[in-house]
Design a protein with these regions (language model features):
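Active-site/substrate-binding loop(s) of hydrolase catalytic cores
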Residues: 1-115
Length: 115
């Protein structure tokens, strides 16, 4: 995320400049701040694995996901990228969106260009 933010905020970066000009960007640097503060990799303070809460988030179990989903529903989403990290892997990786009912082959082709 740090690298993406550097590119997006650097006035001298041509890629960042074009993205700022052509796109409305919504970035969530950390979907699980309370869990991260407690040293949790996947679960929030309520003990919910946020990776498994996207289909039916609730205010009680996954308020973080609910807030993000509500914003996505409100503003619409043309493209999303879910970047993950793992202490056992020295690099970040993309998590896929397979299984989403509205996911199309065309979206998949565009998405997997970034792997």
């Amino acid at each position: 995320m740090e690298g993406a933010l550097e590119v997006l905020t650097d006035p001298a970066d041509s890629v960042g400049r074009e993205l700022r000009k052509r796109c409305r960007l919504h970035l969530v640097p950390n979907c699980n701040p309370d869990g991260s503060k407690r040293g949790n990799l996947r679960v929030n303070a309520a003990g919910s694995n946020l990776n498994r809460e996207w289909e039916n988030p609730t205010a009680e179990k996954s308020p973080e996901v609910l807030a993000i989903r509500n914003h996505m529903d409100k503003t619409g989403v043309d493209f999303a990228m879910d970047v993950h990290g793992d202490e056992a892997i020295p690099v970040s990786f993309l998590a896929g969106f397979e299984g989403i009912p509205s996911w199309t082959d065309e979206q998949g082709e565009r998405y997997y260009r970034y792997e």
